[in-house]
Swiss-Prot record:
Name assigned to this protein: Adenine phosphoribosyltransferase
Keywords: Cytoplasm, Glycosyltransferase, Purine salvage, Transferase
Pfam families named in the record: Pribosyltran (PF00156)
Subunit comment: Homodimer.
Taxonomic source organism: Anaeromyxobacter dehalogenans (strain 2CP-C)
Family: Belongs to the purine/pyrimidine phosphoribosyltransferase family.
A GO molecular-function annotation: adenine phosphoribosyltransferase activity
Reaction it catalyzes: AMP + diphosphate = 5-phospho-alpha-D-ribose 1-diphosphate + adenine
BP terms from Gene Ontology: adenine salvage; AMP salvage; purine ribonucleoside salvage
E.C. number: 2.4.2.7
Record keyword Protease present: no
Entry keyword annotation includes Transferase: yes
Purpose: Catalyzes a salvage reaction resulting in the formation of AMP, that is energically less costly than de novo synthesis.
């Protein structure tokens, strides 16, 4: 089922820096049939569960999270890099290969009792997704799990996400 999607993801060597093979998902997005197949697959995984909010991780997570939220009848919210959200936020810091990064969430975006799904395009090391999950927990909400278009399994990112459900449409 995902063969057409896999075929549209292209490898771009040495991007954004030498030694990295970047997974370019833009051909998936530009083809309406493939894009619909991806969204339908995401929705199919979570349709039987009560999802109150879907969080999209900046920035490509937004592309998938918004239509998933719409299809599930859930709210859509975003986590962004520091200083990009206009209202009061909470911040979660996470480790990068060289240094650290951070994500922010509006303090009123989710709350106690909300059942939350976190969505991003690619699961690599798990640092960014894990930070988003910790933001959910800090707000007293329930983390249902994570969904990704692709997982780079050789980086073992799912291990960084604890016991949460991890749903990846494709594995590389």
């Amino acid at each position: 089922m995902m063969d057409a999607v896999r075929a549209r993801i292209r490898d771009v060597p040495d991007f954004p820096k030498k030694g990295i093979v970047f997974k370019d998902i833009t051909p998936v997005l530009s083809d309406p049939h493939t894009f619909r197949e991806v969204i339908d697959a995401f929705v199919g995984r979570w349709k039987g569960e009560r999802v109150d909010k879907v969080i999209g991780i900046e920035s490509r997570g937004f592309i998938f999270a918004a239509p998933i939220a719409y299809a599930l009848g859930a709210g859509f919210t975003i986590v962004r890099k520091p200083g990009k959200l206009p209202w009061e936020t909470i911040r979660e810091v996470y480790a990068l290969e060289y240094g650290e990064g951070a994500l922010e969430l509006h303090i009123d975006a989710i709350g106690p009792g909300d059942r939350v799904l976190v969505v991003d395009d690619v699961l690599a090391t798990g640092g960014t997704a894990g930070a988003a999950g910790r933001l959910v927990a800090r707000q007293g909400a329930e983390l249902l799990g994570y969904s990704f278009l692709a997982e780079l399994s050789f980086l073992n990112g799912a291990r960084q996400l604890g016991h949460a459900k991890v749903h990846s449409l494709l594995t590389f």
